[in-house]
């Protein structure tokens, strides 16, 4: 169910086609992530000035924030070709060897979900990143011998939503590590306005801001919502997205003022109504919602934690006072604060 949500930050096949047309090509076109962009600008200028390939770079952060877009921008700024793959797609060491031997000087190899590379593949990648060499074993048995094949200098750009799952040897081989954060409302408004121009959709500044501020600080979600609001404006209004049209469309899509959809509210209500506000274990909560544990951790929780609606404690998940207030539910006064280290206490009955 989470894969069908408008506010799901993960990409689907429909998104991928549209994202290509909306993707920035240069750092000057990239909106937001100012610190990362400035650091990349300096690194790229220095590498080009020395006529060298860019240092291996890692982007990490929640999905939908532009890690793939930045990799394409870096390749374009370096005047290099980019080869795009992902951790799960490289199943065997031979798959990676085939990719590496086809790279040209200064090419960029972008590995999405780099934390999902298996250990055998990582062992091949280590010397390739460090020494620009590919170690091969020729033959079998007693007659087997090792062969080192030199590779042209290239750049590996990795992307991950789970930095902690990267092995230390792999993480250490990335010279530059950049954290991408959720975007501000101003940046989101600018992104929506830019996407609307590219898609040929008339939109007012107020309409763009309304969509942007409800998109959970995530450009992928903003672009997805924009397409749905465009459809609404075309059928119900005169095709232009005004503030009122945006509000009406978002109400129909059940995306509230803070960017929560019905599934977010259902999760919070489950904690509050089924488990007395928590704490509740992740597996128990997933079973109650008929959701996967990974979906709750990766899709639902990051934004709810950012809003302060949810707490993670050693005893389980807890709905905060803010969550009660947002849902219009009375908050039970407790004998100890909800954020006490021992977790929430029994609600006061008398």
Swiss-Prot record:
Binding positions (ATP): 22-23, 64, 67-69, 130-132, 173, 183, 220
GO biological process, one term: DNA recombination
Principal subcellular localisation of the protein: cytoplasm
Source organism, top-level taxon: Bacteria
Subcellular location: Cytoplasm
Gene3D superfamilies (UniProt xref): 1.10.8.60, P-loop containing nucleotide triphosphate hydrolases, Winged helix-like DNA-binding domain superfamily/Winged helix DNA-binding domain
InterPro entries in alphabetical order: AAA+_ATPase (IPR003593), AAA_lid_4 (IPR041445), DNA_helicase_Holl-junc_RuvB (IPR004605), P-loop_NTPase (IPR027417), RuvB-like_N (IPR008824), RuvB_C (IPR008823), WH-like_DNA-bd_sf (IPR036388), WH_DNA-bd_sf (IPR036390)
Reaction(s) the record says it catalyses: ATP + H2O = ADP + phosphate + H(+)
Gene Ontology annotations for the cellular component aspect, listed alphabetically: cytoplasm; Holliday junction resolvase complex
Entry keyword Nucleotide-binding: yes
Residues reported in the UniProt entry to bind Mg(2+): 68
Ranges where the record places region Large ATPase domain (RuvB-L): 1-183
Location of the region described as Small ATPAse domain (RuvB-S) in the Swiss-Prot/TrEMBL record: 184-254
Protein family: Belongs to the RuvB family.
This protein's name: Holliday junction branch migration complex subunit RuvB
Source species of the chain: Chloroflexus aurantiacus (strain ATCC 29366 / DSM 635 / J-10-fl)
Primary gene name: ruvB
